[in-house]
Structures are given as structure tokens and as C-alpha cells.
Design a protein with these regions (language model features):
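Extended, subdomain-level signal for the structured scaffold at the beginning of enzyme domains
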Residues: 1-116, 124-127, 145, 157-158, ...
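Short, structured coil segments at secondary-structure junctions
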Residues: 50, 112, 131-133, 151-152
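Short, glycine-/small-residue-rich phosphate/pyrophosphate-handling segment
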Residues: 131-149
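Structural detector of well-ordered beta-strand residues that form the stable sheet scaffold
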Residues: 116-117, 138, 157, 168
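Short pre-catalytic strand/loop immediately N-terminal to key active-site residues, enriched for Gly-Thr
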Residues: 110-111, 163-168
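Short glycine/threonine-rich catalytic loop with a Thr-x-Gly-x-Asp
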Residues: 169-174
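The feature captures the short pre-catalytic strand/loop hairpin that immediately precedes
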Residues: 154-164
Length: 235
């Protein structure tokens, strides 16, 4: 009996398109892509390539927009999307984008999914679902003071990406690409991933590594502002 396809959920409603570019790194080592590229004369990696099914949930099945004004058709709503995913990748929307159905989906999917990844401020979106208490995590580096103010229950670290059990969180979009690439190298056949998932896209997650090489530079006004009050409706 053939193994079940890997189910990969991608939360992209109202996010930066760059936040979910790592999806391509996951998709390139798929059986479908291996068959397509072998037909072009590239090495046949199909024996190493799993079947994959990508799931794109949103509030409704209407077209959604990601930057810069790209229109995407969801495959599921948050209410009917499967929760037991192999990988859930959460991009980063504005901090005012918090659909209740999305919070329910993240809470239930976090409990049942094997791996949960966030990029940029997607970690704050996941934290709003109440599942990250006591976890080590990161977010967009420029937004770490905001994250610490809004979600003090999380141990926020100043790193390009952080791994805590099944939770993988990254800083900005570039760090997210490197994080997904690192996960793919550790999870799938590394030669296959390097050739099909990274080199073809000119990505190298080892070039900058997991840790920042320069100190953070947060404006004092950002450190002093009451972000929790602001997003609760204050000023």
C-alpha cells in the first residue's frame, strides 16, 4: 500500500507573500515535482520524493489577498480544514488580523499536527491562540519588543529561528526561508533537497545560519510603548 501523502497546511490570509515562500522549498522535493523535472532530463529523484497535498485555509472560500495584491483561492475554510497535518506553516498578518475561526483552527491544529512553523509575526498570530505558553520562540526581529509586551507568556529569543519540540518559529521572511530549508534538509533526503529544493531556487540556509551576527537596534520609543494597551484599543 502506498504511503499517505504528506499534508501541508499553509495559512496565508492577509500575509506577506515572502512569509510563505518556503512552501516552494517543501514542494520542490515532492513526487509530483520529481516526475516533472525528470521528464526534462534532470536526475530522477522520484524514489526519494513523497507525495504531498497542500491545504490553504481561510475565513471563507472567497479569494483572499496576499501582498502585493496577489489573489489566491483557498482550498478550505478554517472550520472545515483538517487539523491533523504533517506540517502547518503560518505566515505573518498584521496584528489586527485575528479571525476567531483562525484562532480555533490554530489551537486545534497545533494539538494534532506533527510540525508547526511560523514566519515573521506569524508566531504572534499563533500565540494569540493560547498554545505557546512557556515555549521558546522568535518573531520578526524588529517586532520582538511588541511580542514580549503582547505575549509575555512566551520566552522570546533574539534568533533568526528557534526550534522548541515540534514548534519552529522564525524571524523575518528571509529567516523563514532558511528555517524551512533547514527543516527540509533534516527531514527529507538531503541530496535531493539540496538539488531540487535549494540549488534550483538559489537558496542556501547555511549561509547566514540560525543566529544573528549583529546586535539588535530597537528605537527607545518602541521599547517604551505600551503595545498591549495599543492593541487592546488604547493609544
Amino acid at each position: 500500500m502506498a504511503p499517505k501523502p504528506l499534508r501541508i497546511g499553509v495559512m496565508l490570509e492577509a500575509v506577506q507573500i515572502a512569509d510563505i515562500i518556503g512552501t516552494d522549498i517543501l514542494g520542490n522535493p515532492s513526487a509530483h515535482y520529481a516526475r516533472e523535472t525528470s521528464a526534462m532530463g534532470l536526475p530522477d529523484f522520484s524514489a526519494h520524493a513523497p507525495e504531498m497535498k497542500f491545504i490553504y485555509p481561510a475565513t471563507t472560500l472567497d479569494r483572499i489577498f496576499v501582498t502585493p495584491d496577489i489573489k489566491v483561492m483557498p482550498t478550505h475554510t478554517y472550520d472545515d480544514a483538517p487539523r491533523d497535518l504533517d506540517i502547518l506553516l503560518i505566515g505573518g498578518p498584521m496584528l489586527t488580523h485575528r479571525p476567531e475561526a483562525a484562532d480555533r483552527f490554530m489551537k486545534e491544529a497545533y494539538a494534532k499536527s506533527k510540525i508547526v512553523m511560523t514566519t515573521c509575526v506569524g508566531s504572534m498570530w499563533l500565540a494569540s491562540a493560547g498554545v505557546m505558553k512557556g515555549m521558546k520562540a522568535t518573531t520578526n526581529r524588529e517586532c520582538l519588543p511588541i511580542a514580549k509586551s503582547l505575549h509575555p507568556e512566551v520566552e522570546w529569543l533574539d534568533q533568526r529561528w528557534v526550534v522548541d519540540g515540534k514548534l519552529w518559529t522564525s524571524g523575518g521572511a528571509g529567516a523563514g526561508i532558511d528555517m524551512v530549508g533547514t527543516y527540509a534538509l533534516q527531514t527529507f533526503d538531503p541530496i535531493f533537497v539540496w538539488v531540487m529544493g535549494l540549488k534550483l531556487l538559489d537558496f542556501d540556509p547555511t549561509a547566514r545560519g540560525q543566529f544573528y551576527k549583529d546586535p539588535p537596534q530597537w528605537p527607545q520609543a518602541m521599547l517604551e510603548r505600551d503595545w498591549a494597551k495599543l492593541f487592546a484599543g488604547g493609544s
